[in-house]
Amino acid sequence: MNDVKYDVNDMPKPGLLVGLSFQHLFAMFGATVLVPILVGIDPAIALFSSGLGTLAHLTVTKYKIPAYMGSSFAYIAAMQTLMKTDGIAAVAQGAMAGGLVYLLVALIVKYAGKDWIDKVLPPIVVGPIIMVIGLNLAANAVNDATTLNKSYSIYALLISMVTLFAVILFNMYGKKIVGVVPILLGLIVGYTFSAVLGLLTGHSFINFSEVAAAHWIQVPNFDIPFVDYSFKLYPSAILTMAPIAFVTMTEHFGHVMVLNSLTERDYFKDPGLDHTLTG
């Protein structure tokens, strides 16, 4: 166990706060950016929406739940299909339909209570659903960890394994601040190993040319209704994505259960499941 622990509302020292912030950024970055890349949407839009969504969730839940709102893997297949057939307008409409389902269930919970949810979705049901969502993307993780320039590379696998084991070792045996930021330290080890391996083999594993060429500040490529496209109702998008909201809702219940265990609180009661769903 780590010697350094902070409660939900505790404020770490400035140095540790910066380290934890960067670790959280890198931890969420991969998943949040991967979904729009797989779907064909500008990742900057996902990051911007994710930030607004997190702030909205924190506000609605009265800053009591330490949660981040990122991209959902459950919608990938549906969004990919809609992007090919009807475009971004249909995807946006389907996402809004999913949000309305959340609000509807939140209203039901507010006035009817949550006991019915406990009966329909006990932990033994919620757990496997979360596992399936994660394992369904295992192929993407393996592919990213073993390919370089879209082809298999033993060097990519080696770098991935070094990074993975570094994170595991820091997490299991790190003391104090080292054990608190294992992901950040694992990334540093991975980048350092990549640079050294590149020098030894003559291969270039690190390329910052696109970063150097990118603008420091740039507005995401938003697609605005009535400006970039004409409004049209997409029943197929609504019927496709609205039901998936119940899948991600189950995932949400699991996340809250885990947070309850980690923080030794009951967020189903305070601020309440209706608030977490609305957020």
Regions found by a protein language model. Give the residues of each.
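Flexible hinge motifs at transmembrane-helix junctions and intramembrane kinks/re-entrant loops
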Residues: 38-43, 152-155, 165-224, 231-254
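Membrane-embedded helical hairpins/re-entrant loop segments and their flanking transmembrane helices
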Residues: 5-15, 37-58, 240-279
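Membrane-embedded alpha-helical modules
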Residues: 85-201
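N-terminal signal-anchor module of multipass membrane proteins
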Residues: 1-69, 73-87
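Buried hydrophobic positions in well-ordered alpha/beta secondary-structure cores of metabolic enzymes
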Residues: 39-42, 70, 122, 181, ...
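Alpha-helical transmembrane segments of integral membrane proteins
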Residues: 15, 19, 23, 45, ...
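Intrinsically disordered, low-complexity non-transmembrane regions of multi-pass membrane transporters
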Residues: 1-19, 203-226, 261-269, 275-276
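Hydrophobic alpha-helical segments embedded in the membrane of multi-pass proteins
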Residues: 29-30, 45-55, 71-76, 100, ...
